[in-house]
Amino acid sequence: MLQNIKHMTLKQLALTMTATILVLSGCAKEMTLNDAVSFLYEYMSIADKGDYSEDFFKANAEVALKARREMPWGKQLNDQLFKHFVLPVRVNNERLDDFRTMYYDTLKARVNGLSMHDAALEINHWCHEKVTYTPSDARTSSPLASMLNGEGRCGEESTFTVAAMRTVGIPARQVYTPRWAHTDDNHAWVEVWTDGKWSFLGACEPEPELNMAWFNEPASRAMLMHTLVFGDYDGPEDVIRRTENFTEINVIGNYVKTRRNIVTVKDSTGNIVTGANVGFCIYNYGEMFPAVTLKTDQNGQASLHTGIGDMFVWASSGGRYGTGLLHTDRAEDCGIVVTLDHNDTEMMDIDIDINPPAPGRIPAEASEAAIAANKLRLAREDSLRLAYTATFTDEVNAAERLGLATEYSDAACKQLIDAKGNWREIREFMVKANDNDLLREGLEMLKTLSRKDIRDTKCDVLWDALISAAKPNFISKNNENIYFDFVLCPRIHGEFLQPFHMEIWNTLAPYIYGNEEANEVTTPDGAASLADKIISWTKKNITVANELNARNLQATPAGTLRIRKADSRSRDIFMIAALRTFGIPSRIDQMTGKAQYMTDNEWIDIRLESATSGQVSEKGTMTMSYVPGKGTLDNPEYYRHFTLSKIQGGNRQLLDFEGGDATELGADASAKSFSTPFTLDAGTYLLTSGTRLASGKVLARMVTFVVEKDKNTDVQLVMRESKEEISVIGAMDPEALYQPLEGEKKSILSTTGRGYFLVAVFGDGDEPSNHAIRDMQSMSAELAAWGRPIMVFGQSEANAAKLRGLLDSDMTSFGIDSASEIRDMLCDGCHSETKTLPVIAMCDSFGRTVYLSTGYNTSLASQLRAVIAGI
C-alpha cells in the first residue's frame, strides 16, 4: 500500500482517501446525472457524438437513474453493473431512439410486484407481444422500428429485448455467436443479471424459465460467444480486447467446456513475428469467417478460449500470410505454429477437413405444467401481435388508403404494402410528392431503398432527400438509372437516413465556387475538377480517427460534418454524400467496398490517402468451371457453398454480391453465373468452397488465382465429396401407427409404400422449424422430381393444418405427433443424443434410416440434395 501511495499524484491520493472515508463511514457516493452523462461521453463512439444531441443522452440517463431508484432490485446493482449493463443506450449498431424514455412507465407497471427473476421473464413476454422473428438485411433496426413493424431478425430482437430490460433497471447484454460451427448461420440472444448471476434467454422467445431456449443444443456446439460491453469493463469474464469505446468479452465458458488456443507466428526464417494479425476463423457460408482477429504479443503469440472444435487460422504481417488448423483432438490447451510462407503472388491450393464440436445439450429445467402454461401465453401474445399487424396495408385496402388517381397508382400501392407499420409515413410522402408533381421521381427514389428503409424512414427525411437532391447533369441526363441510383438515392451505405444535402451544400459551396454562381457541370473535365475539389475538402477537413469508432458504426453525413471527425468508412460515406449533393454520381461499391465517382461513363476509384484523388483500376476477367460429382450440388450458391476474396497485403477481403444490383451477377450468384467472363480488378484472389456433411463436418478447399489486366482467368470450382457412401445410421418401425390429419390411425408403410421416404416432424413456430420449412419450400421442385413420399408431422391438428398450407404437394401426407411418438422413434432408433425439433429423417420401407437431422440446421437443403443423389 505504501509503495503504491508513493507513485500517486496528489489528485489521485485525495480521491482515494475520500473514497476510503466514504466506505468507512458506511456511505457511498450516489451517481449523479452529470456522472452518468460524463461516463457515456467518455466511451461514446464519435459517430454517436455527431449524430445525437447531449440532451438525448441526458434524457436517457435520467430514466436509467430513475429506474435504479424506483425498481426494487435497484439496490442490488453496484456501479459496475449499472454503468456497463443498464445505463448505455446503445446495444449493437442500431439507430438509437426514444424507446427508454417512452416505455419506462409501461414496463414498470408490467413488472410491478414481481421479483427480479420473474420480471426478466415477464419483460420477454412483453417483447414477444410486440416483435417476432423475420429474416432481413444487415442494418439493425432501432427498438421502436422493430415494434412499428412487429418483426426483426435475431440481432434486432435481442437489441429490442436488451433495451426493454435495461429500461426497468435489469442489467442485460446481447450475446453473439458470430458463426455457428456445425451449420451455416449465426445467432444473437440476451443475457440478464438477476439475483447475483447471469442467465440467458431467447429474445422475444419466452420460455417458462431462464437458461431455456431453442438454441440450448446448438449453443453446446458453439466455438465462440462474445459481447461488446460499453466502456472499460473489468469483470470476471475472459477479455478478448479493449478499445476506446468498449471491452469485448468472451462468455463461451458460461455455456460449454473450453480450451485455450495458442497461435505462434513465425517468419520464413523461423523468427517470431510480433504485431501480426491472427484471424481465428470458423467455416460458415462458404468462407473462413474471422470470428476474432488478435495481434501477436512480444512472444509472437495470440491466444483465445473457444469451444472444442476445429478452427482455421489465417495470420498475416508485412504483406505475407500463412495458415494453420487448430484440431478437435486436443481437448486441453492447443498450440500451433503458423509460418508466414506466402505473399500475394505465391499460389495456395489446400484441402481442409473441419470438425465442429460434438453434439451436446445445455441442461434446462421446467415442469410440464409450466411449459403448457407458457404455450398458452405464447398463443395469446401471437394473437395480440397479429391483431396489430392486421392493420397494415394489403392488396385489398391499398388503393383506398392511397387515395390517389394517377398512372403511378400501382407502383405507389406496392410501396404502401411493403411499408408495413410505416405505411402512414410513406403515404404522406407519396401524397406530398404527387401534390408537387414529383410522384414519379419520389417512387423512383423509394425503389433505390431497401425494404427496411421503407419500413422505418420518416416522411420528412424522404421529402428532404427528394427536394434537396441535385438535378440531373450531363452525366446522368441520358441515363436515368445512374441519376436515380447514384445521385437521387439518399442511402449511401449502412448509415441511418437523415437529411444532409443542405448542410453539406451550405458548408462546401463557398469553398468550391467562392463568390461566383454555381454552374451546371457540362463536361467530363468539369466533373473531374468538381470531384477533385470535394475530395480535397474532405481530406483537409475530416480527420480520420478509426480508434474512436471501434464499433465501426456508420455515421450519417450530417453527423460527420458537425464534428469534422470520423472513421475511414464514415468519411467515405460523407464524401459520397457530398459528391451526390453537387450532382456527381458516386457510390461505395457493394462488391469491393471502394468509394467511387463516375465521369465520362467510367467509375473512378477515390484514393484519399494518395496524391491523386482518383484513378481507374486495371481490370481483368474470370470464369469458373464446375462439374458436379455424384452426391454434390448441381449449381453451388455463392455465400452458401463458395466465396471469393481478394488478397492484398496478405489480408483477405470478401467480395460481397448480396446487394443484388451491385454486380451483373445479382444477389442469387451461383457457379453457373460465372460461366461467362466476370470483370474484376486485377490482382490475386482466393476461392473458398465447402461441402457440409450431416454431422456438421466440412470438407473445405481453398485455392488462389491471379486475374491479370485485360486477360481472362479460368478457375475450377471443386465441391469435395465424402468418401463415405450413404450408410445406414439407425432403424425405425415402418409399421408404426400414426394419426393422419384426417381419418383414423394407420401405419407409416400403408402411406409410403415400398422404397425410400422422407419424414419431417416440426415444432410450432420455433425458429429452427421455420428455417427447415423454408429449406423444404426451396426444394419443392426437386422433391417433386424425386417423386418419393414425404410425411410431415405437426404438434397439433392446427399446427399440422398450417404445415399443409405451407408444404402441400401430391406426394406429401400430413399427420399429428402430439405425443412425440414419431419423433422419439426416429431419434431413439439412431441413438441420437438430442431430440430437438425439427427432426428430419430419410428412411426406407425396410426400417432403415440413412439420414437424421435434429434441431437447428441451415444446411438442410444441401444435405438432403446430397442424400437424394446418393440413394
Question: What does each of the following model-derived ranges do?
Answer:
Residues S268-E287, G309-D310, L530, K630-G660:
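Short, ordered, surface-exposed loop/turn motifs in non-cytosolic proteins
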Residues A109-L114, A119-H125, T134-L144, G152-R241, ...:
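Hydrophobic/aromatic-rich core segments of domains that either
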Residues L803-L837:
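Short, internal strand/loop/helix patches
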Residues K29-N149, E381-I563, S610:
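Secondary-structure boundary elements
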Residues N284-H305, N651-F674:
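Short, acidic Ser/Thr/Gly-rich low-complexity loop/linker segments typical of extracellular
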Residues I748-A772, M776:
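Short active-site neighborhood of thiol/selenol oxidoreductases, capturing the structured segment around
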Residues G319-N343, L693-R720:
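Structured interaction patches on ligand/partner-binding surfaces of diverse proteins
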Residues T836-T854:
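A short, hydrophobic beta-strand/beta-hairpin element that forms part of a small beta-sheet core
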